[in-house]
């Protein structure tokens, strides 16, 4: 399913270290030629200090050739640089290991106070911060993400938000936590980075748009692994205008992930309301991006094309199973998508043949009946089954006029927001730019 693979588009907005897990996944799925993927890895590794990894990839690619001299020399250089930086950083690290310093770090959020404490007790100087940052960056480039995260934490606690490396250190810390799969810490870092970007009054509107676009892509790692991720992704991508604007302007392919998060959301009430807002966005962007997942929603909720929805659902399975971020959502997606087809079909028909439903849901009649029985049993459906006639008779789920007014009022704010964003989007079309080089080609640090 290379046709629907988004790795190339997404990698453009990621740090090169974050691309490696995606390439490993593609290698397992055998979507692309293995040699092409190995060439891609080698190219990504060329500007990192992960020389041993690069050597392993080179051996896999050219089994009958010797390791190039340039790689061997680079390894010697990297080891020498690492030893030098370790020697420079060792006295600084010892300061942080002091029990009193640890207590100070835990009890105060004021970086200036902590800096003054370290200066008074240990002779800490401003240039030590630059040394700490350089060492953290070097550790990251070597693939030692735990070391990078530790030193970047010390750095973040001490530097003011105006420091020239403050923002880049937040990107580096987030990348390190993602690569170590520390999802709670990554969620905290993601929130902190978002606040920094949103409160930045120095960046131009175009720079802020670029930062939000990168954040949207990096956040996929966190949102599809953290327990609260599928709620948070909806709140950020759909209901925060600046981020929805970034998606519509720079990366409409992200709608695949927003749509999946909505469909697989466990809160049934929230899911139904959010779906209405999502459908409007999908309709607006259908001319710039579509795939089986967004088309499934369009078939079902715009065209009421049940045969088309069923066909798209089968295609969705292939898309999900071959998507790095969505493969774990497959079962939830299929289950909830079938429920959506069923619910929509039931709104139109009061009495439904089980065999017809089975056909619409791509199930056997026996499977469909068991599935409906479970829905009724779990109080997710107001209906009765007539086993003799093979029919499902729907209960009366009429919505009160009061509730209808509430629902319509809720949608007014969203429609106003969409109108404002469309105006802004048109004004941004001429200033659309590519991501800066470090997003995909250099480290996550500036």
Curated annotation (Swiss-Prot):
Nucleus listed as a keyword: yes
SUPFAM superfamilies the UniProt entry points to: Winged helix' DNA-binding domain
CDD domains: eIF3E (cd21378)
Keywords: Cytoplasm, Initiation factor, Nucleus, Protein biosynthesis
Molecular function in Gene Ontology: translation initiation factor activity
GO cellular component, one term: eukaryotic translation initiation factor 3 complex
InterPro entries: eIF3e (IPR016650), eIF3e_N (IPR019010), PCI_dom (IPR000717), WH_DNA-bd_sf (IPR036390)
Region (Disordered): 425-446
Pfam families: eIF3_N (PF09440), EIF3E_C (PF21357), PCI (PF01399)
Domain named PCI: residues: 222-399
Main location: cytoplasm
Subcellular location field: Cytoplasm; Nucleus
Biological processes per GO annotation: formation of cytoplasmic translation initiation complex; translational initiation
Disulfide bonds, paired cysteine numbers: none
Residues making up the signal peptide according to the UniProt record: none
PANTHER family: EUKARYOTIC TRANSLATION INITIATION FACTOR 3 SUBUNIT E
Assigned protein family: Belongs to the eIF-3 subunit E family.
HAMAP family for this protein: eIF3e
Subunit structure: Component of the eukaryotic translation initiation factor 3 (eIF-3) complex, which is composed of 13 subunits: eif3a, eif3b, eif3c, eif3d, eif3e, eif3f, eif3g, eif3h, eif3i, eif3j, eif3k, eif3l and eif3m.
Functional description taken from the UniProt entry: Component of the eukaryotic translation initiation factor 3 (eIF-3) complex, which is involved in protein synthesis of a specialized repertoire of mRNAs and, together with other initiation factors, stimulates binding of mRNA and methionyl-tRNAi to the 40S ribosome. The eIF-3 complex specifically targets and initiates translation of a subset of mRNAs involved in cell proliferation.
Name of this protein: Eukaryotic translation initiation factor 3 subunit E-B
Gene name in the database record: eif3e-b
């Amino acid at each position: 399913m290379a046709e629907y693979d988004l790795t190339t588009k997404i990698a453009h907005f990621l740090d090169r270290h974050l691309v490696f897990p995606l390439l490993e996944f593609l290698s397992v799925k055998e979507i692309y030629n293995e040699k092409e993927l190995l060439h891609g890895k080698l190219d990504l590794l060329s500007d990192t200090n992960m020389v041993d990894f690069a050597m392993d990839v080179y051996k896999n690619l050219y089994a009958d050739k010797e390791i190039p001299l340039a790689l061997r020399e680079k390894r010697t250089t990297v080891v020498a640089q690492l030893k030098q930086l370790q020697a420079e950083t060792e006295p600084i690290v010892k300061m942080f290991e002091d029990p009193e310093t640890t207590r100070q770090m835990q009890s105060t959020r004021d970086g200036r106070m902590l800096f003054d404490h370290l200066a008074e007790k240990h002779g800490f100087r401003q240039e030590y911060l630059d040394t700490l940052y350089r060492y953290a960056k070097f550790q990251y480039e070597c693939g030692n993400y735990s070391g990078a995260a530790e030193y970047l934490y010390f750095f973040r606690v001490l530097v003011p938000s105006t420091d020239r490396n403050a923002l880049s250190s937040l990107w580096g810390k987030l990348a390190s936590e993602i690569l170590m799969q520390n999802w709670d810490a990554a969620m905290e870092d993601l929130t902190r980075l978002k606040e920094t970007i949103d409160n930045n009054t120095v960046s131009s509107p175009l720079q802020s748009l670029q930062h939000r676009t990168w954040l949207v892509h990096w956040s996929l790692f966190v949102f599809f692994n953290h327990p609260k991720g599928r709620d948070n992704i909806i709140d950020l991508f759909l209901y925060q205008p600046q981020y929805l604007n970034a998606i519509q302007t720079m990366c409409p392919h992200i709608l695949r992930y927003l749509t999946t998060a909505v469909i697989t959301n466990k809160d049934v009430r929230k899911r139904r309301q959010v779906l209405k807002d999502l459908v409007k966005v999908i309709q607006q962007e259908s001319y710039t991006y579509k795939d089986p997942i967004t088309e499934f929603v369009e078939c079902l909720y715009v065209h009421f094309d049940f045969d088309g929805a069923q066909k798209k659902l089968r295609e969705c399975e292939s898309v999900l199973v071959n998507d790095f971020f969505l493969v774990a959502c497959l079962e939830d997606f299929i289950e909830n998508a079938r429920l959506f087809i069923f619910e929509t079909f039931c709104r139109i028909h009061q009495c439904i043949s089980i065999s017809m439903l089975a056909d619409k849901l791509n199930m056997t009649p026996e499977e469909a009946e068991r599935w409906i029985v479970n829905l009724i049993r779990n109080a997710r459906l107001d209906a009765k089954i007539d086993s003799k006639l093979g029919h499902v008779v729907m209960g009366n789920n009429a919505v009160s006029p009061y509730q209808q007014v509430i629902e319509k009022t809720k949608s007014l704010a969203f429609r106003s927001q969409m109108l404002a964003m469309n105006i802004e989007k048109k004004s941004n079309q001429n200033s659309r730019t590519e991501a800066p080089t470090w997003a995909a080609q250099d480290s996550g640090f500036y």
